[in-house]
Curated annotation (Swiss-Prot):
This is Prostaglandin-H2 D-isomerase. Belongs to the calycin superfamily. Lipocalin family. It is found in: Rough endoplasmic reticulum; Nucleus membrane; Golgi apparatus; Cytoplasm, Perinuclear region. Residues 1-24 form the signal peptide. InterPro entries: Calycin, Lipocalin, Lipocln_cytosolic_FA-bd_dom. Glycans are attached at residues 49, 76. The active site is at residue 63. Its EC number is 5.3.99.2. The modification Pyrrolidone carboxylic acid is found at residue 25. One of its GO terms (biological process) is mast cell degranulation.
Length: 189
């Protein structure tokens, strides 16, 4: 049996080599610029391991989100989406949780703590985000999200999201591009 000091040394070495990565340590957009991330985004694509998502993905539709600065250095993420033929608006408080581009929030469904990382963005067209739940007794909740500045992301962006989601272990049937719904997505250019 390994001594406690050799066990810690082994874990430290694995962490240094990048073998043990947490969502916050997973790749982040280099030199993330929070001010360029602000503004309107559309949730254009999703992938998740959630049983709820897999059951409901055929009835989900695109939502509009507004990212605004919060006093604590994080973001207020206000999303408007269609639910039961009504537009519903909800706001999440994204709190800084590490280097720029890494945030945490409390799920409105169950109160669990989640970490979201902006993995890649060009700020003008798309952003790829990865969300994961903290330690829990069951399987970790994971989600990949494609944000786009327009309601119709191009083929290259869609392909980039598909590759991004698959690289995080999501299968083809766990990836969905959300259809537009005219009711809640006014453009306001």
């Amino acid at each position: 049996m390994a001594t406690p000091s050799s066990l810690w040394l082994g874990l430290a070495l694995l962490g240094t080599l990048g073998v043990l990565q947490t969502p916050a340590q997973a790749s982040l957009q280099p030199n993330f610029q929070e001010d360029k991330f602000l503004g309107r985004w559309f949730t254009s694509g999703l992938a998740s391991n959630s049983s709820w998502f897999l059951e409901k993905k055929k009835v989900l539709s695109m939502c509009k989100s507004l990212v605004a600065p919060a006093p604590d250095g994080g973001f207020n993420l206000t999303s408007t989406f269609l639910r039961k033929d009504q537009c519903v608006t909800r706001t999440l408080m994204l709190r800084p949780a590490g280097p720029p581009g890494c945030y945490s929030y409390t799920s409105p469904h169950g109160g669990s703590n989640l970490e979201v990382s902006v993995v890649e963005t060009d700020y003008k067209n798309y952003a790829l985000l990865h969300t994961e739940s903290g330690p829990s007794p069951g399987p970790a909740f994971r989600m990949a999200t494609l944000y786009s500045r327009s309601q119709a992301p191009g083929a290259a962006v869609r392909e980039k999201f598909t590759a991004f989601a698959k690289a995080r272990g999501f299968t083809e049937d766990g990836i969905v591009f959300l259809p537009r719904n005219e009711k809640c997505l006014e453009e306001h250019e």
